[in-house]
């Protein structure tokens, strides 16, 4: 029986950022998958010259051999890309590229999507607020009213978020019993179905300092978080919490946790990036497609330099391949 080969689609991200540099690096990294990149051919070749590397544009899908060839789907840019310098209309072309990529994955032309960093501020200027790939792709998939969520992953260290790109002042009112319950269920289901963890152990942080200290520093733990945890434990889920966030990410809990669930963006991502920067992978849970991405931004100041670290990008591709294989089991 012929082994199924994962088909991965990459969107190269902000043209002036390091996305193109990372794609050049990919040309010399072998993967057991067919990999296609949505990008501008001219800009990619220019970036390769800047890096003093030769790449070959491939016209037919093939196993990614890592011998300098890249399968490209050309995306037109309005102006010449100047490394490190934002050009609004080139940046906005990324929205169309994301649209094309997501639809291609929905139509099962590709097994998984890997996205490289974009400039959120520029993309928001298109008329609709762009708060991030997670929310934008969720709308494209028609899952915006479901608990789609961000999970960051580095081997067996995983952190998921209840809320993502909202102001800290808006976090408490955004955490309702229903939202928290659905978020925990989404996390649990994805860990079972996509990561193949039979009974996930999930450690949940509190919202307030000391997890509220019995109501002294806030009541969300007593009113919302604890009742939801108890309800779901009664339904058979393996949950621990609410744990004070300042001690949650310590060796004791790391050893007994398949995934942490943090209440807001920096509460979960600050410790994760401190421990896993350049090795972390973002993935979006609750979507009908597989989507992964790097754990860093556009890094305009590093474009064309030798300081670029491609580890997170390569790990994003590797996880996309793994999740594809798991989904087919």
Labelled PLM ranges:
Residues 1-220, 225-329:
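Anion-binding alpha/beta catalytic cores of soluble intermediary-metabolism enzymes, centered on
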């Amino acid at each position: 029986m012929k082994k199924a080969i994962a088909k991965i689609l990459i969107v190269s991200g902000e043209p002036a950022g390091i996305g193109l540099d990372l794609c050049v690096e990919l040309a010399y990294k072998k993967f057991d998958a067919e990999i296609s990149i949505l990008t501008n051919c001219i800009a990619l070749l220019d970036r390769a010259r800047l890096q003093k590397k030769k790449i070959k544009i491939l016209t037919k899908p093939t196993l990614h051999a890592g011998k300098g060839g890249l399968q490209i789907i050309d995306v037109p840019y309005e102006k010449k890309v100047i490394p490190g310098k934002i050009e609004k209309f080139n940046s906005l072309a990324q929205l169309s590229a994301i649209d094309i990529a997501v639809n291609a994955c929905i139509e099962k032309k590709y097994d998984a999507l890997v996205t490289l960093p974009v400039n959120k501020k520029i993309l928001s200027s298109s008329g609709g607020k762009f708060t991030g790939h997670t929310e934008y792709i969720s709308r494209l998939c028609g899952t915006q009213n479901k608990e789609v969520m961000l999970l960051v992953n580095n081997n067996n260290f995983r952190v998921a978020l209840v809320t993502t790109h909202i102001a800290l002042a808006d976090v408490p009112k955004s955490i309702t019993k229903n939202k928290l319950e659905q978020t925990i269920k989404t996390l649990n289901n994805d860990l079972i179905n996509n990561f193949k963890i039979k009974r996930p152990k999930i450690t949940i942080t509190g919202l307030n300092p000391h997890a509220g200290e019995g109501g002294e520093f806030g009541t969300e733990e007593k009113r919302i978080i604890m009742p939801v945890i108890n309800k779901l434990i009664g339904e058979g889920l393996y949950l621990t919490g609410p744990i004070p966030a300042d001690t949650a990410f310590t060796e004791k809990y790391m050893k007994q946790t398949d995934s942490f669930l943090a209440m807001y963006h920096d509460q979960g991502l600050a410790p994760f990036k401190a421990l896993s920067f350049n090795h972390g992978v973002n993935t979006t849970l609750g979507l009908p497609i597989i989507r992964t991405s790097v754990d860093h931004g556009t890094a305009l100041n590093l474009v064309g330099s030798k300081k670029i670290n491609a580890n997170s990008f390569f790990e994003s591709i590797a996880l996309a391949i793994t999740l594809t294989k798991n989904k087919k089991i």
